Regions:
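Acidic catalytic/metal-coordinating carboxylates
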Residues: 34, 60-66
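Active-site residues of response regulator receiver
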Residues: 53
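Alpha4 helix (beta4-alpha4-beta5 surface) of REC/receiver domains from two-component response regulators
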Residues: 63, 85-103, 109-114
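Acidic, metal-coordinating helix/loop segments flanking the phosphotransfer/catalytic sites
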Residues: 31-49
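Two-component/phosphorelay signaling modules centered on CheY-like receiver
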Residues: 12-30
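Residue-level signal for the "D+5" position in two-component response regulator receiver
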Residues: 31, 56-59
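Conserved acidic carboxylate
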Residues: 9
Length: 121
């Protein structure tokens, strides 16, 4: 069985785009539509990497990320943030900045797979 990626994204079309980009890989995909749902799913499944949108419904990406990194069992879990905003827009992430991989929403399939493989491939 391949490694597991959790996609935390509130927009169904972006879920579909990322899933399509990864369909020819061995990665299993878990979907969550906001940070709160992702936390519930983390109680049941442990992904090898999280792809995280920043602007979400119930719990935004920055809040989820900081909560996740505060949990000892997930502090080293790789997270790739995909957002239409830049990393500078998230002052709350300043202290963990060296550990953040930040990609634009227009990321190519090749770049996304390259970044994932560099972390868990």
């Amino acid at each position: 069985m391949g490694k597991t990626i959790m996609i935390v994204e509130d927009d169904q079309s972006f879920h579909d785009i990322y899933t399509e980009m990864l369909k020819d890989t061995d990665y299993e995909i878990i979907r969550a539509y906001d940070g709160a749902e992702a936390l519930v799913k983390l109680g049941k499944e442990k992904p090898d990497l999280i792809i995280l949108d920043m602007i979400l419904g119930m719990m935004n990406g920055d809040t989820f990320f900081l909560y996740l990194k505060g949990m000892p069992e997930y502090k080293d879990l790789p997270v790739i943030i995909i957002s239409s905003q830049s990393k500078r827009d998230y002052k709350s992430l300043k202290d963990v900045e060296p550990h953040i991989i930040f990609l634009d929403k227009t990321v190519t399939k090749e770049k996304l797979i390259e970044e994932i493989n560099a972390r868990i491939g």
